Regions:
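STAS-typified acidic loop motif
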Residues: 2-41
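Short, well-structured hydrophobic secondary-structure segments
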Residues: 32-57
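A cross-taxonomic marker for long C-terminal extensions/tails that follow the last structured domain
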Residues: 2-5, 9, 111-125
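Glycine-rich, often proline-containing surface loops adjacent to acidic residues and nearby aromatics
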Residues: 23-26, 56-61
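Structural preference for beta-strand elements that scaffold enzyme active sites
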Residues: 59, 94-96, 120-122
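Amphipathic alpha-helical interaction surfaces in cytosolic regulatory modules
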Residues: 43, 62-113
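Non-catalytic terminal and connector segments of soluble metabolic enzymes
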Residues: 21, 40, 104, 115-118
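Structural alpha-beta junctions
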Residues: 55, 85-90, 116-122
Length: 125
């Protein structure tokens, strides 16, 4: 299995997705493309493949400035896949949710995910 690197588009409508087999997963930028599924699906598939032989620890760093409703569903899919690995004790998963000091919307979004996903979250401003 190889690392996954999905670069943002030149218009800044898709996020950087940089997933390392070592267990460090990064999602950064903005996610506002209407058909964002095409951008996120390789990441979901990659995580599902990783679950067959995961590293002992996985850290998901989410540093998004903004994301739309379609993106939120894809983020939830990623979190659910990681939750499965965590609950089955295949890997210890931690989510670091970054938000700007004055960005209460992103803080609320992180809290919403934290309330429905059984993973440890660190809210970092």
């Amino acid at each position: 299995m190889n690392d996954l690197l999905l670069k943002p588009d030149f218009q800044g409508k898709t996020p950087l997705i940089d997933f390392k087999v070592s267990g460090v997963l990064n999602i950064e930028g903005r996610s506002i493309l209407e058909n964002i599924i095409d951008h996120f699906q390789p990441a979901v598939d990659w995580i599902n493949n990783l679950s067959t032989c995961p590293p002992p620890t996985i850290t998901l760093n989410i540093k998004l400035e903004y994301f739309n409703t379609r993106s939120s569903k894809m983020i939830l899919n990623i979190l659910k896949s990681l939750e499965g690995m965590h609950l089955s004790k295949k890997s210890k998963v931690t989510v670091n949710w970054y938000y700007g000091d004055d960005d209460l919307d992103m803080l609320e979004a992180g809290n919403d995910y934290q309330s429905i996903i059984k993973l440890p979250f660190n809210m970092i401003s």
